[in-house]
Amino acid sequence: MNFNTELKKNIGCNIVYSSSGGGNCSIILMKFDNGNHIMTYCYWEVQKDGKLIAISEDDITAVTGLVARTIRLFENQKVVDIEIDEGLNLFIEVEDGLTLLVFRDEYDHEDLEMLGDSQDWDYAVPSEDLVLYVMEDSTIKAGKCSSPRSDPLKLIKMD
């Protein structure tokens, strides 16, 4: 399976929901009109035409905070590019020049032993009952949308 190929299926889709801030802190939930969605749990930045306009550490006040207002700007926008790099960082660009850059947390080799079974971000394809989890230890695991997160995940290799 090629993760970038899977993600690129969202190019041309509209973002129908994009939320962060408030009780969600800086976690982002972004839904596409094809039913797929992404959730992020790590540091992110939003740029407009290459200029930084918000980061995950900005004001997370519900509705009115910079995080909430900025992430809502993605709603009703068409995805023009989406990809991951070799470090499994995620990049989503929409038609009006907004770009979401999701940077995975970096860990020292010694820290890897202390990591739990947590993800930095995940990508769900409900039509295929598939969730791909980008884990803190730089692995990718697959689960089912219809299964509880506590069910065992399958380690997968990506092209």
At which residue positions do the language-model features occur?
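Surface-exposed, interaction-prone regions used to assemble/regulate multi-protein complexes
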Residues: 1-159
